[in-house]
Regions:
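GIY-YIG nuclease catalytic motif and its immediate N-terminal context
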Residues: 1-45, 78-86
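Conserved short loop/helix modules at catalytic or binding sites
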Residues: 37-81
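Short arginine-rich
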Residues: 49-58, 86-99
Length: 102
């Protein structure tokens, strides 16, 4: 199991990755990368229920992919903003279709 880093009271933001089923209609899977002050599980439920949701996640999101982000969380807000972009770019460089991550 991945070792979690120590966190302070201000470290309550998280990055998360959602597996997307055929987001472009070409038969290929993709990912959505986001950040939140909620738990990734709570944020995913909000997406699926249409609450402050990215349409692509509401429509194509199947599940969270914790192996890609769990070892990074939690973190301060500024770090989460940076990490969201870094994580998205890392997945793009590996050839994946990535939404979000800005």
């Amino acid at each position: 199991m991945a070792k979690k880093r120590k966190s302070s009271a201000s470290d309550h933001h998280c990055v998360y990755v959602v597996y997307l089923r055929d987001p472009r209609g070409d038969g290929k899977a993709g990912y959505y990368v986001g950040m939140t002050g909620l738990t990734p599980e709570q944020r995913f439920q909000n997406h699926k229920q249409g609450n402050k949701a990215a349409r692509i996640v509401t429509r194509c999101g199947e599940r969270l992919v914790p192996r890609l982000y769990a070892h990074l969380n939690p973190m301060p807000f500024k770090k989460a903003v940076e990490m969201e972009a870094i994580l998205a770019e890392s997945l793009r460089k590996r050839g994946y279709v990535v939404f979000g991550g800005h």
